[in-house]
């Protein structure tokens, strides 16, 4: 199934203008088989707990990805591997949080993309997001696992009200906070769309129309990434921000 994917990526995180610690973590890499892995994790728990959770999660999956000894044969193999490594990472973080008082309550979101040939897998926990640029429109392809999104989906709450709801940042799912992981995995055909993965600190401070305008542009990826972070800080920088940009050359 595997075929070497050619493209460029850029990762960037920033603590913003309010938080003292950056609890967001991101990584992007290509393994020897030409598979692409992109991850953004937004830690939570405060007092450096979230920083440990997000960093440990991304580093563990990175290590497992680089240790792969064979190619993914099909979509089932992709899903099985992602579920396995995320489950293992969850167990490690949960154990650490429950065996060491200083890490009690830590957890993290995860938005992961695995590209294998013409297939794009997303794995989602929490409220970080994956966007694709489809027909010049920025389209969110993951679903926020938040209380307000639950209200929108099940109770018909208007998005305008949800945007100012006092519980709009409350997660309904996080990694490391429970012994069992609840992972949302989806696979779709990949047609070389541009990809943006980001934490809520970015999309809450930069309107989607502006995200799209920058992603559409022809600047280098590092310039786009820095523009996005600068935009977020200009609009208040109320939270840590993490992002990954990917542009295919296939």
State each model region's role.
Residues 1-250:
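PP2C/PPM-type serine/threonine phosphatase catalytic domain
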């Amino acid at each position: 199934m595997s075929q070497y994917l050619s493209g460029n990526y850029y990762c960037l995180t920033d603590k913003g203008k309010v938080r003292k610690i950056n609890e967001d973590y991101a990584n992007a890499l290509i393994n020897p088989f030409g598979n692409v892995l992109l991850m953004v994790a937004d830690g939570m728990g405060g007092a450096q707990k979230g920083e440990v959770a997000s960093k440990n999660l991304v580093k563990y999956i990175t290590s497992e990805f680089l240790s792969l000894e064979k190619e993914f044969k099909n979509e089932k193999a992709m899903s099985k591997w992602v579920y396995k490594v995320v489950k293992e990472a969850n167990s490690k973080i949960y154990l650490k949080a429950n065996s060491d008082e200083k890490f009690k309550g830590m957890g993290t979101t995860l938005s992961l993309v695995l590209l294998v040939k013409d297939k794009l897998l997303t794995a989602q926990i929490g409220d970080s997001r994956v966007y694709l640029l489809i027909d010049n429109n920025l389209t969110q392809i993951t679903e926020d696992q938040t209380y307000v999104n639950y209200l929108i989906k099940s109770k018909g709450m208007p998005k305008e009200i949800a945007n100012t709801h006092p519980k709009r940042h409350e997660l309904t799912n996080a990694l490391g906070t429970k012994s069992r992981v609840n992972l949302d995995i989806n696979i779709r055909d990949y047609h070389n769309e541009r990809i943006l993965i980001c934490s809520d600190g970015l999309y809450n401070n930069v309107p989607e129309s502006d995200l799209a305008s920058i992603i559409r542009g022809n600047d280098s990826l590092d310039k786009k990434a820095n523009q996005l972070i600068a935009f977020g800080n200009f609009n208040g920088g109320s939270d840590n921000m993490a992002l990954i940009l990917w542009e295919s050359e296939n």
